[in-house]
Design a protein with these regions (language model features):
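Extracellular beta-sheet/turn segments enriched in Thr/Pro/Gly and aliphatic residues
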Residues: 2-26, 103-127
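Short, surface-exposed binding/anchoring microloops in extracellular/periplasmic proteins
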Residues: 6-54
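Hydrophobic beta-strand residues in large extracellular and virion-surface proteins
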Residues: 33-35, 44-46, 80, 91-95, ...
């Protein structure tokens, strides 16, 4: 399928109607973002990202799930209140798209303007 199934906006720019969205809030959040599905996705996971160092290589790992949903749909955005986004990603999402493919993304922040966006990533399992 063309394009991404989810877009990310700062919560203040999303124009959410009270009660018209789902939410997951971490303790002491530093930012609120909204995931806006452009089409339905299934098996959604919001999880902790860790890392493993090996020589001069840094490998991102998928750690514990913080929030899961059977599906996300365009009529029900998801607000995430997240901790500070660090240089090395510390949170990620995954879902299964309409073609049945697993899609995984790190939640990252632009070094230029502080915009939070999704970067497609392949995570190792935590070990």
């Amino acid at each position: 399928m063309e394009g991404e199934a989810l877009s990310v906006l700062p919560a203040e720019d999303a124009g959410l109607a009270e009660g018209g969205y789902d939410a997951y809030r971490e303790a002491d959040p530093m930012a609120e973002i909204v995931l806006l599905p452009t089409r339905s996705v299934t098996d959604f996971h919001y999880f902790i990202v860790g890392f493993r160092e090996g020589g001069d290589q840094l490998t991102l790992t998928r750690e514990d799930d913080l929030y899961t949903a059977d599906a996300l749909s365009p009529d029900r955005p998801l607000l995430l209140a997240i901790p500070f986004v660090e240089t090395i990603p510390n949170r990620g999402i995954s879902y299964v798209d309409a073609d049945g493919a697993l899609r995984q993304y790190a939640i990252v922040e632009s070094g230029k303007d502080g915009t939070i966006f999704l970067m497609e990533e392949v995570f190792d399992s935590a070990a």
